[in-house]
UniProtKB/Swiss-Prot annotation:
This is Large ribosomal subunit protein uL10. GO terms for molecular function: large ribosomal subunit rRNA binding. The keyword rRNA-binding applies. The keyword Ribosomal protein applies. Part of the ribosomal stalk of the 50S ribosomal subunit. The N-terminus interacts with L11 and the large rRNA to form the base of the stalk. The C-terminus forms an elongated spine to which L12 dimers bind in a sequential fashion forming a multimeric L10(L12)X complex. Belongs to the universal ribosomal protein uL10 family. It comes from Christiangramia forsetii (strain DSM 17595 / CGMCC 1.15422 / KT0803). GO terms for cellular component: ribonucleoprotein complex; ribosome.
Amino acid sequence: MTREEKAQVIEALTAQLAENPTIYLADISGLDAGSTSNLRRACFKANVKLAVVKNTLLAKAMEAAEKDFGELPTVLKGNTSIMLSETGNAPAKVIKEFRKKSEKPLLKGAFVEEAIYVGDDYLDTLVNIKSKEEVIGDIVGLLQSPAKNVVSALKSGGGKIAGILKTLSEKEG
């Protein structure tokens, strides 16, 4: 690979790192061609981009990017694949689902919405992270529930009051 080609790859990686709020680093070494193809299909279905990258080029792209990747560059040893997604937990779900059939891919680290996770033990934590849309949905649901409770109380309360008044008027009448 010439210097110009390396510079182009670094530039492309830097742009991808800047565009995506969710970046996972995984080790897919040891997977045969069929398993790798199945992993790529699973990533495509989950709207996750998967690419094998050279550690040195990715490290330089991380340095050039405006984000603070903290300890993440320290995991750039051995085989590294980068998984990019708009959703924070999509790559983790793909990895967890795929590991039901195989020991790989191993999670090396992740950068999710400015938070850094290093190591495979964070996989379950990352699977349970809610996406921005899910959190917004939960907040909207919480905000709507008190209003619904007040409306239902008024509806049921109004019926009770009318029933009591009717009963009292019948007793007097």
